[in-house]
Amino acid sequence: MARRTLITVCVIFFLLSLYIPSNGAPLKITDVRYWSAPDHTRIVVDSDKSISYQTFQLKDPWRLVVDIKEAKATFDSRKITIEDSTVHHIRIGKFDRKTMRLVIDLVKPTQSKVFTLNKYLDKPYRLVIDLHRTDLVEEGKKARLKQKSKKYKIIVVDPGHGGEDSGAVGSRGTFEKNVVLALAKKLKRCIDQKKGFKAFLTREGDYFVPLEKRVEIAREYGADLFVSLHTDANFSKRVRGASVYCLSTKGASDEAAKLLAERENASDFIGGVSYASNRDLDSILIDLVQTQTTNDSLRFGGMVLNGMGNVHTIKFKRPKQAGFAVLRATEVPSILIETGFISNRDDENLLRNKSFQLKLAKSLSKVSLNFVDMLAKRDGITVSDGTARKGKGGVHLVKPHETLWRIARDYNTTVDELIRLNNLKKSGHVRAGKKLLLP
């Protein structure tokens, strides 16, 4: 009798479990989004839970298939047309009772990187699919290195944020990523008008570039100056004005600078970066951490504030310092400009205004050009068109204030090659008067 009662109870519990909702409910796919860059496409799948997935590739035609387990969508099957350099279409629909299938129709074979991200701030659980055309990645790198061999001076302008990472948002719905990109393009046009100078952007559209990649781009171009553009935000709508920040390896100049650096450094987490590979930003000790380059950055920052003061409200009269990742590994004078508080209605209206953007770009261009000219005269370098000198196995006598970065560029070689050939320390520090063997 007891055994029969036990069986009856078990059957009842089993039947009830069919009707009682459980924690094992399928995850909901709420959206599928994408961003196109010159050499890659990023696809992001949003969901209400952490995603379990499997991937495989198919040929003739080339496709990447992503199966999302225990999932359903809040929308019907859909087809998203992209038609960029990497992807034709995205198709998503129900594969079987428990699986949603994402099929990505590729232009050519790609190098894919798929990873998940947990909830972060206002971002949901995400599945990120990065598709890189290795041929286009290599072409872009070669093009940047080719510019490095030119004799003209190069200023790399870095429009902050982009793609998934919108940055700060104003009360009128203004995205920081859009404002700084528009300003960066105007700044580039102003710089390019000056003979002997050329400006390049770390991104030219609405797509995400990791902080480490921005640094790498500046290196490949052989930048003489690095300017990162951002907008600030504050809980108080009354706070406004522009400010300039430089790198500090010894802690922030104040708590506000520290908090700002933490916010800007969070860009990778918001934009979506997988940290499976080793990151060396914190361990790199090169010319920038030497006193001369840091002082040059502070001097440049002060000149920028003086110039901007003629066209804009200034919040802090002197540059502040903190551990900004995007400034941490460049070997040239580097600053981060907060062009205003997008949380303030007056600043937001100004930053949206094309005439003001041009006025600000002209001010930044004038100061940047003057500063590079000043450094060139100090270091005994002529700003002109043409190509770099060839080493041909000769010897170079290091001048005061000269860095390995600049020497390598002048002789169309690399810092690593100079370090190897001259048995230098990996910090890259070199003293004036030293004779360097050239490759």
Question: Regions from the language model: what does each represent?
Answer:
Residues 1-9:
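Bacterial N-terminal signal peptides that target proteins for export
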Residues 9-18:
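Bacterial N-terminal signal peptides
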Residues 22-155, 175, 397, 409:
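Signal-peptide-cleaved, periplasmic/extracellular N-terminal interaction regions immediately downstream
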Residues 45, 66, 104, 129, ...:
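Buried hydrophobic packing residues in well-ordered domains
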Residues 53-55, 66, 285-381, 420:
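Active-site-adjacent mobile loop/cap segments within catalytic or ligand-binding domains
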Residues 136-281, 290-302, 358, 419:
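Catalytic-core regions of hydrolytic enzymes
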Residues 390-397, 414-439:
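Extracellular LysM carbohydrate-binding repeats and other cell-envelope/extracellular binding modules
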